[in-house]
């Protein structure tokens, strides 16, 4: 079952924000899993999709929000703690929302079109978990600027709830020659905006918005779990 909220993004949105999600066309979404989870993640970023799947299996709550939904690959392959989870999908791209909602139609799914750089149009302190995988490197600005997305995610998580995710970093982590070439190419296309994204800034943003967090890296991907105050 899928329900859809009214859009909160009808006003003008920064063009770079639009560009960062515009590549998620219906045709690209059909090959996204192959391109990302069989392609760039293991071959360019040196981060196996098994790492992300393990994070989802251990962090997902019964009432979950996914921000930047892609195709729903990770949610579709995840083990939820309950048989009938509630899932709220948040994205700026209607194609991604529709594709993922259809893929997860065995669950109770709500879609919300929203900009992660603005406060989320969701109930505060109401959700068990928020996932933000492979999102921030597509959002314009440095980590110091777009780290506000972490604040917005934290605002909707219940006390003691978890915000988790992964993002491709350009410095402070090992970047292979193939990874650097791919990163530069995607930044030139406007698909990525991570040329200023580094590990230390990500750590500082997590520390600013959460009392407790874990941050690690696999290849050039920063991976975090962060908990709100009990």
From Swiss-Prot:
Pathway listed: Antibiotic biosynthesis; Polyketide biosynthesis
Keyword Mitochondrion appears in the UniProt entry: no
Paired cysteines (S-S): none
Gene Ontology biological-process entries: antibiotic biosynthetic process; methylation
Protein name: Demethylluteothin O-methyltransferase
Keywords, in A-Z order: Antibiotic biosynthesis, Methyltransferase, S-adenosyl-L-methionine, Transferase
Pfam families: Methyltransf_12
Catalytic activity annotation: demethylluteothin + S-adenosyl-L-methionine = luteothin + S-adenosyl-L-homocysteine
Mutant phenotype after disruption: Inactivation of the gene yields a mutant that can produce nor-deoxyaureothin and its C6-hydroxylated derivative, but not aureothin.
CDD domains the UniProt entry points to: AdoMet_MTases
Primary enzyme class: transferase
SUPFAM superfamilies given in the database record: S-adenosyl-L-methionine-dependent methyltransferases
Family, per entry: Belongs to the methyltransferase superfamily.
Name of the gene: aurI
GO molecular function: methyltransferase activity
InterPro entries: Methyltransf_12 (IPR013217), MeTrfase_VrtF (IPR016584), SAM-dependent_MTases_sf (IPR029063)
Top-rank taxon, per record: Bacteria
Entry's EC annotation: 2.1.1.353
Protein function: Methyltransferase involved in the biosynthesis of the antibiotic aureothin, a nitroaryl polyketide metabolite with antifungal, cytotoxic and insecticidal activities. Catalyzes the methylation of demethylluteothin to luteothin (also called deoxyaureothin). Is specific for its gamma-pyrone substrate, and does not act on the alpha-pyrone isomer.
Organism of origin: Streptomyces thioluteus
């Amino acid at each position: 079952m899928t329900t859809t909220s009214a859009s909160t993004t009808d006003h003008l949105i920064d063009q770079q924000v639009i560009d960062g999600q515009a590549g998620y066309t219906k045709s690209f979404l059909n090959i996204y899993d192959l391109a990302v989870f069989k392609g760039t993640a293991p071959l360019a970023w040196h981060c196996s999709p098994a790492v992300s799947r393990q994070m989802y299996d251990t962090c997902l709550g019964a009432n979950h929000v996914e921000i930047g939904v892609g195709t729903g690959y990770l949610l579709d392959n995840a083990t939820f703690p309950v048989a009938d989870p509630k899932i709220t999908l948040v994205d700026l791209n209607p194609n991604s929302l529709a594709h993922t909602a259809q893929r997860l139609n065995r669950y109770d799914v709500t879609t919300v079109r929203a900009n992660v750089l603005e406060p989320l149009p969701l109930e505060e302190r109401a959700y068990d978990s928020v996932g933000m995988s492979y999102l921030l490197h597509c959002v314009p600005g440095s980590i110091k600027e777009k780290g506000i997305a972490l604040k917005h995610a934290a605002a909707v998580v219940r006390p003691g709830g978890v915000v988790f995710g992964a993002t491709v970093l350009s410095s402070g982590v090992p970047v292979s020659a193939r990874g650097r070439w791919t990163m530069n190419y995607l930044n030139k296309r406007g698909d990525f905006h991570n040329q200023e994204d580094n590990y230390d800034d990500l750590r500082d943003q997590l520390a600013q918005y959460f009392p407790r967090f874990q941050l690690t890296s696999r290849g050039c991907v920063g991976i975090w779990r962060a908990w709100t105050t009990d």
